Structure formats: structure tokens, C-alpha cells
Regions:
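Conserved PLP-enzyme active-site core in the AAT-like
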Residues: 2-16, 21-25, 99-102, 107-108, ...
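Conserved C-terminal alpha-helix-loop-beta "cap" of PLP-dependent enzymes
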Residues: 14, 27-30, 336-424, 428
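Conserved N-terminal helix/loop that builds the PLP phosphate-binding region
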Residues: 54-57, 63-116
Length: 447
């Protein structure tokens, strides 16, 4: 098969060192390159290969390969070199540089790799949004919670959390942490007396809570609980996924760490999975060391997709805030709705807290239909615009019945967490409010 070689970027800039780099590039027909690029969009593991092949084919600055001098250096055209940043490994310019990087400060080699994988730019943007000293991005929001808990809670430690919590996080706490001798106190989100009692009677390492919480959108006074925790030597970690960094900056209110599922608002397009932990550099560095040993690395294509999503984060969240508030107000007045949970409503028990620490109330509205399990299920089936899925925060509206989607247990088990048969969680997208309202009305009229 014929080959073609390309000169190095340095030679284009007038480098007369005489050492032209060369690379053997398989000469596929243009149609194959297009097909490979299309397939790569469906399979992110091939995206780097597709980009390099396509870039090499399209680059017209081909030169004859120089075999003289007895030296061969790996290289491609400038376009292909740029594309190769979206690969799964970091490449060293010189073999001799590797020992120096290894012997340097622990973060030196990792920094080079993060830059190539795209996560370095991502982490800097997130740190700026959260006003954090440092951020580490990982493969998922769940892994972010696991890495944080595994790093900051010592064996034999004690944690405090709330009844309203992402279910898989709770399952991990209940099943995995006891294997390390870690005990746990679970409190109601608004029960500050129970929090103080737990802090007074246990050697608490960490208080971990969401705010707003899932699915009832309860709000914890971050400044208050941070003072309570710090007075007893405990850390405070806030899962701020339901708020997004646009609406809430927990670190400025006293939290030590903030966790996000970047899958939700941050990426915002329901097409990528990722998570992040932000906070003081001292704490994030500990998580980063654990992360580099255990794995859970955010792949390069995911980094790109999240960076893309962050370009419109503020626009999307502002739109979702506005539409969700209008939807909550509308639902609260509808005769077929028994109750609405939304921190932007004066009827919400922590509305005053939300107003004091949030600039917007988020795009998720939870509510209870005036009906039973079956009528609620039918309502979900009748809506036409929202997708039926267990996620939130994206451009598309999503609706689900937690009793089916997340808590498919016995009714007695659901009652422990307050999950009623008629509960609905509605994640507002960027669709027009009137379109969403009319869709909800027609579905309610059928039950």
C-alpha cells in the first residue's frame, strides 16, 4: 500500500535543522475517511484514529520522506498533531524528558497528561465557576462521590448524611463504607438539632449532603452547617448538582468541597457522563492522587463534550430557571396537582434559605398528582414533549415517576424515604414554556 510522509510543524516555520520528521500514513480513499469519521462519532474509542487519518489525508503539505542520517522521528502534520491531543495517552517529546518529569513534583507528569486529555482546561474553567482553588474531573458523578468519600473519610471514621440523597450514593454508603469500619448517621435535611447531636456524640469526619436535594429539593443552610461542622473539626461536602455552579457557589458559603455530576447541567446535552470535585487544593490533591491510582479517568471525547456544553451553561440554566419557576407556579394552582416541591415557591419550607444562597432555583420541579399509582403512570405516558428517563439538567425536558424509575421497591420501603406513588420529577429543558404547559395540561385532562 502506498504511503505518504509529512514534515514536522517546526519545518513549516522555517526550521533548517535538516531533521525532517516522517510518519507512515495508510492511504485510505477519501470515502473511507468520511465513513470512519462518521463511525467514530458513534464510538468514541475510535475518534482519535479517525481524526488523525482524516487530518493526514486532507493535509496537502506532503514532502518526500528523508531516510538519510540514520534517524527517524515520529511525527505528523500540524493538523494531525492538533487532532492527536484527543487520544488516550500522553506522548513525551524526548525519551530523556521522562525521568525528569517522574522525579519532579508529583503533579508535573500528571499535568502534561491532563493537558493532552483535555481535562486541564476543563478543570480550570470549573474552578473559576465554583471559585475553587482546584478541581479534578472524573468519569462520573457517582465516581466523584466515591473518590471523595474514599479519600477524606478514614477507616473507622463517622459520616453524617441526609435522607434525601441520590439513591446509589446512599447504597454505597450503606454497603461499602462499613467494610472500612465507617459508621453513619442519617438525618432529615432540616433537622439541625439532629446534626448537632451527631457532631457532639461522634468523631465526625464529614457531613455530606445535597442542596437542593433529590427529589424533594430541600435546601440546607450551607453557611450554618459549615460553622457547625468546622466547630467540631468535621469537613463539609456539598453535592451541588441540582443547583449548578451558576445558581449556587457552596465554597463561598463555607463548604470544603463541592461535588457535581457533570452529566447534568454542566454538560447539558444528555450525551456524556462525567463528574467533578472542587475545593481547596490541599483536599483536591488527595482526591487526585487516589483518582490517578484507582482510575475512573474522564475520556478525551467526554472532556471535549463537557467543554462544549459549558459554553452555553449560563444561557441554559437561566432559561431553565425561568421556565421551571413559571411551571411550578402554574402547577401549584392546578386542581389536579396535590403538591409542588420547588425552592422558588414561597410555600417551600426552605424558600428563605434558597433565596439567601441561590441566584436561581434550578430547572427541576417535583410534584404530586392528585391520583394513585396507575393514574400517575398514565399521566407520564400521556405527555408528549418530555423524555421518560432518570436524568435531569439537559436541553431536553425529562419526566419520571420515582416510584418506578428510581425506587422500584415495596411501598413500605419507599415510605421510609417519603417516595409516594403519585410523585413526579420534572426536569425542565430549553423548550418554550407554553409548549410544555399545554403538553402537561392535555396529559392531566386524560386522567
Amino acid at each position: 500500500m502506498a504511503t505518504v510522509s509529512f514534515s514536522s510543524p517546526a519545518s513549516f516555520a522555517g526550521d533548517n535543522s535538516g531533521a525532517l520528521t516522517s510518519a507512515t500514513i495508510l492511504r485510505f480513499p477519501p470515502n473511507f475517511v468520511r465513513q470512519l469519521s462518521t463511525k467514530a462519532r458513534r464510538n468514541c474509542s475510535n475518534i482519535g484514529v479517525a481524526q488523525i487519518v482524516a487530518a493526514a489525508w486532507s493535509d496537502r503539505r506532503a514532502v518526500t520522506s528523508h531516510s538519510g542520517g540514520g534517524s527517524r522521528v515520529r511525527g505528523t502534520s500540524s493538523h494531525a498533531a492538533a487532532a492527536s491531543a484527543a487520544t488516550s495517552a500522553a506522548a513525551a517529546a524526548e525519551v530523556g524528558a521522562i525521568p525528569n518529569a517522574k522525579l519532579a513534583q508529583p503533579s508535573a507528569a500528571a499535568l502534561a497528561e491532563r493537558a493532552l486529555l483535555g481535562s486541564d482546561a476543563l478543570e480550570k474553567k470549573m474552578s473559576a465557576l465554583e471559585k475553587a482553588e482546584s478541581t479534578v474531573f472524573v468519569a462520573s458523578g457517582m465516581y466523584a462521590s466515591v473518590a471523595m468519600l474514599s479519600t477524606l473519610v478514614p477507616a473507622g471514621g463517622h459520616i453524617v448524611t441526609t435522607t434525601d440523597l441520590y439513591r446509589k450514593t446512599r447504597i454505597y454508603m450503606e454497603t461499602e463504607l462499613p467494610k472500612r469500619g465507617i459508621t453513619m448517621t442519617v438525618i432529615r435535611p432540616a433537622d439541625m438539632d439532629a446534626l448537632q447531636d451527631a457532631l457532639d456524640n461522634n468523631n465526625v469526619s464529614l457531613f455530606f449532603t445535597e442542596t437542593p436535594t433529590n427529589p424533594f429539593l430541600r435546601c440546607i443552610d450551607i453557611e450554618l452547617v459549615s460553622n457547625m461542622c468546622h466547630n467540631k473539626g468535621a469537613l463539609l461536602c456539598i453535592d451541588s448538582t441540582f443547583a449548578s455552579p451558576i445558581n449556587q457557589k457552596a465554597l463561598t458559603l463555607g463548604a470544603d468541597m463541592v461535588v457535581h455530576s457533570a452529566t447534568k447541567y454542566i454538560a447539558g446535552h444528555n450525551d456524556v457522563i462525567g463528574g467533578c470535585i472542587s475545593g481547596r487544593d490541599e483536599l483536591v490533591s488527595k482526591v487526585r492522587i487516589y483518582h490517578h491510582v484507582v482510575g475512573g479517568v474522564l475520556n478525551p471525547n467526554a472532556s471535549y463534550l463537557i467543554l462544549r456544553g459549558m459554553k452555553t451553561l449560563h444561557l441554559r440554566v437561566q432559561c431553565q430557571n425561568s421556565t421551571a419557576l413559571r411551571m411550578a407556579q402554574f402547577l401549584e394552582e392546578h386542581p389536579k396537582i396535590a403538591r409542588v416541591y420547588y425552592p422558588g415557591l414561597p410555600s417551600h419550607p426552605e424558600h428563605h434559605i434558597a433565596k439567601s444562597q441561590m441566584t436561581g432555583f434550578g430547572g427541576v420541579v417535583s410534584f404530586e398528582v392528585d391520583g394513585d399509582f396507575d393514574s400517575t403512570r398514565k399521566f407520564i405516558d400521556y405527555v408528549k414533549i418530555p423524555y421518560h428517563a432518570p436524568s435531569f439538567g439537559g436541553c431536553e425536558s425529562i419526566i419520571d415517576q420515582p416510584a418506578i424509575m428510581s425506587y422500584w421497591d415495596s411501598k413500605e420501603q419507599r415510605d421510609i424515604y417519603g417516595i409516594k406513588d403519585n410523585l413526579i420529577r420534572f426536569s425542565i429543558g430549553v423548550e418554550d414554556f407554553e409548549d410544555l404547559k399545554n403538553d402537561i395540561v392535555q396529559a392531566l385532562n386524560k386522567i
